[in-house]
Amino acid sequence: MRTFAFLTAMLLLVALHAQAEARQARADEAAIQEQPGADDQGMAHSFTRNESAVLPLSESERGLRCICLLGICRLL
């Protein structure tokens, strides 16, 4: 009976250890994905509408610009 209890305890410890390693691997992977890469930093995109566009612009649309920085866009 002691042997059975010992084997059961060992099996549970091995299972818990494997589960802890899997959780740690997922946490490490998530931390790596959250860190911005060197090529992502400082990258900005700016879009402006050409004055010679096919459709004429109204007074309120003149000078309308969109600036996107790190996935966040805003109109100026």
Curated annotation (Swiss-Prot):
Propeptide: 23-64, 74-76
Crosslinked positions (Cyclopeptide (Cys-Arg) (interchain with R-65 in subunit A)): 73
Signal peptide residues on this chain, from the entry's feature table: 1-22
Keyword match ATP-binding: no
Coiled coil residues, start to end: none
Alphabetically ordered keywords of this record: Antibiotic, Antimicrobial, Defensin, Disulfide bond, Fungicide, Signal
Position of the Cyclopeptide (Arg-Cys) (interchain with C-73 in subunit A) cross-link: 65
Any single biological process term in GO: cellular response to lipopolysaccharide
InterPro entries: Alpha-defensin, Alpha-defensin_N
Disulfide bridges in this chain: 68-73
Record's comment on post-translational modification: Forms a cyclic peptide with subunit A (BTD-4). An additional intersubunit disulfide bond is formed.
Function noted in UniProt: BTD-4 has antimicrobial activity against the Gram-negative bacterium E.coli ML35, the Gram-positive bacterium S.aureus 502a, and the fungus C.albicans 16820.
Assembly and oligomerization: BTD-4 is a cyclic heterodimer composed of subunits A and C; disulfide-linked.
Protein name according to UniProt: Theta defensin subunit C
Gene that this polypeptide is encoded by: BTDC
